Amino acid sequence: MTIEVLDRGFVKLLDHMGDDFSAVKAARISHGRDLIDEERDRKLIEYLLRSGHESPFEHIVFTFHIKCPIFVARQWMRHRIASYNELSGRYTELAEEFYLPDLYKRYGERLNENDLQKASKLIEESYKKSHEAYKCLIDMKIPKELARVVLPFATYTQFIWSVNARSLMNFLSLRADSHSQWEMQQFALAVAQVFKSICPWTYESFIRYRYEGDLLKGVNP
């Protein structure tokens, strides 16, 4: 399952371990029980999230492949209860891939046409110059780990993210929210879409009882 985000990014589900029933089994082991029936299992998930008993959801794990601008990745990796492995700019020559924001769509009502054109041109030109400098430094045999210092935060990076459902729900509360940067929001909404497809009962109860953001309430991600 791959969801395209922004102009060049994506959220791709590589693997997952468990689903709604994994949390039910983990919760019922406390009393030496297993799955009972669908309706009671669903109500148990609702009870767990309503009462804040979230440890059973740590047994559901997702592994994603993420491609996003570096400035988004740096916000993402502040969520430390997870595992990350990122594309290395020390060993890999970074592609000429930069996030180009759609200023007209985002700020067309607040900025005049002339300023929007100037801003878009300035961003594109700065990207081009920085990558030209990067390539020149590499051609001069400057190590890639040092040559990359001229590249902007808008450069695309890639990483693998493994996270349990409990931590993922915390991520969504903070990032699928209007207080988060818009670009970060778009990736969080894509993650929410994957989460909902794998764990629909958990997702529904999470939104109802534990979600602290404002972008997912009353909408389908």
Curated annotation (Swiss-Prot):
Top-level class of the enzyme under EC nomenclature: transferase
Residues covered by the ThyX domain: 9-209
Transmembrane intervals: none
A Pfam family this chain is assigned to: Thy1
Annotated catalytic residues: R175
Short motif (ThyX motif): ranges: 78-88
Catalyses which reaction(s): dUMP + (6R)-5,10-methylene-5,6,7,8-tetrahydrofolate + NADPH + H(+) = dTMP + (6S)-5,6,7,8-tetrahydrofolate + NADP(+)
Pathway noted in the entry: Pyrimidine metabolism; dTTP biosynthesis
UniProt-listed GO biological process terms: dTMP biosynthetic process; dTTP biosynthetic process; methylation
Any GO molecular function: flavin adenine dinucleotide binding
Cofactor(s) listed: FAD
InterPro entries for the chain: Thymidylate_synthase_ThyX, Thymidylate_synthase_ThyX_sf
Positions bound to FAD: S55, R78, H79, R80, E86, N164, A165, R166, N170
Residues annotated to bind dUMP: Q75, W76, M77, R78, E86, L87, S88, G89, R90, R148, R175
The EC number(s) this enzyme carries: 2.1.1.148
Cofactor binding annotation: Binds 4 FAD per tetramer. Each FAD binding site is formed by three monomers.
The keyword NADP is annotated on this UniProt entry: yes
Keywords linked to the UniProt accession: FAD, Flavoprotein, Methyltransferase, NADP, Nucleotide biosynthesis, Transferase
Gene3D superfamilies associated with the record: 3.30.1360.170
Subunit annotation: Homotetramer.
Family that this chain belongs to: Belongs to the thymidylate synthase ThyX family.
Role description: Catalyzes the reductive methylation of 2'-deoxyuridine-5'-monophosphate (dUMP) to 2'-deoxythymidine-5'-monophosphate (dTMP) while utilizing 5,10-methylenetetrahydrofolate (mTHF) as the methyl donor, and NADPH and FADH(2) as the reductant.
Name used for this protein in its record: Flavin-dependent thymidylate synthase
